[in-house]
Amino acid sequence: MRHISPEELIALHDANISRYGGCRECLIRVGQRPLSGEFRPELPTKRSPTFSKSPPPTWWLQREGIYSMMPISVPR
């Protein structure tokens, strides 16, 4: 597997944020039908705020567990 630099990772994340317009937690709820039967895909709730800007890259990386999953630099 090719090594991905942190800069590439952040760029990929920013591309995903701009393409899909939100964080993964928000996107999971977008388009789901509430128990009442109403279907309002664009309605933000208190549990899923819509971010006008993407969260800080370091916070995102830590939240996604990438820091613990793969080392930042691997000497070859």
Swiss-Prot record:
Protein name as annotated: Protein tec
What lineage does the source organism belong to? Viruses, Duplodnaviria, Heunggongvirae, Uroviricota, Caudoviricetes
| Superkingdom classification of source | Viruses
